[in-house]
């Protein structure tokens, strides 16, 4: 073998070794690149998932807050309209006190209560509009005093002096009690059933 052949053979061998090393290096570089890429994709996927979860939680929290706020607003609005009904009914008391049924009811209450008092002194409080009617019902009973209360819309309050008890038959109290007991039914009538 001559020198050139030997040189060619050596060069070919070195070329093959370089090619093999380059191929290995290229494979290693591609592997490292793929691993880096996969790691980056995994990290960003994890971050994206965390952001999605966090955003969902924020949305659910905001949704819950808005639902509570909506319910609160609805309750305030319902209460407003229920109070409007109460005010309208309260305004109608002026018509009730003009009826014969009202006068008969007051007369029945007074006659029943006066029978029970015997010798005890009693003060009957009434609205200024009812004073004459109540004085007429009481007649000349010396144990009964009739006084007006500007705040009363109708009905009577009877104060027993000896015992210190007051029996309240005022229309406002009766209306309040009836209205409170019917609040649910009124709400159902205004806004539909539950």
From Swiss-Prot:
It is found in: Cell membrane. GO terms for cellular component: plasma membrane; proton-transporting two-sector ATPase complex, catalytic domain. One of its GO terms (biological process) is proton motive force-driven plasma membrane ATP synthesis. Keywords: ATP synthesis, Cell membrane, Hydrogen ion transport, Ion transport, Membrane, Transport. GO terms for molecular function: ATP binding; proton-transporting ATP synthase activity, rotational mechanism; proton-transporting ATPase activity, rotational mechanism. Gene3D superfamilies: ATP synthase, E subunit, C-terminal. It is a peripheral membrane protein. Component of the A-type ATP synthase that produces ATP from ADP in the presence of a proton gradient across the membrane. Belongs to the V-ATPase E subunit family. Has multiple subunits with at least A(3), B(3), C, D, E, F, H, I and proteolipid K(x). This is A-type ATP synthase subunit E. It comes from Saccharolobus solfataricus (strain ATCC 35092 / DSM 1617 / JCM 11322 / P2) (Sulfolobus solfataricus). The gene is atpE.
């Amino acid at each position: 073998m001559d020198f050139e052949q030997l040189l060619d053979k050596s060069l070919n061998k070195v070329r093959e070794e370089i090619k093999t090393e380059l191929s290995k290096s290229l494979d290693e570089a591609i592997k490292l690149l793929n691993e880096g890429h996969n790691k980056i994709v995994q990290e960003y996927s994890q971050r994206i998932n965390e952001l999605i979860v966090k955003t969902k939680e924020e949305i659910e929290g905001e949704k819950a807050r808005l639902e509570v706020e909506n319910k609160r607003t609805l309750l305030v609005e319902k209460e407003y309209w229920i109070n409007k009904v109460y005010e309208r009914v309260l305004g109608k008391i002026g018509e009730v006190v003009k009826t014969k049924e009202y006068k008969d009811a007051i007369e029945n209450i007074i006659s029943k209560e006066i029978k029970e008092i015997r010798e005890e002194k009693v003060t009957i409080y009434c609205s200024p509009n009812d004073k004459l009617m109540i004085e007429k019902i009481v007649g000349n009973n010396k144990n009964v005093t009739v006084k007006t209360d500007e705040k009363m819309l109708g009905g009577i309050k009877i104060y027993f002096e000896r015992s210190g008890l007051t029996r309240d038959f005022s229309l406002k109290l009766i209306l309040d009690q009836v209205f409170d007991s019917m609040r649910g039914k009124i709400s159902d009538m205004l806004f539909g059933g539950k």
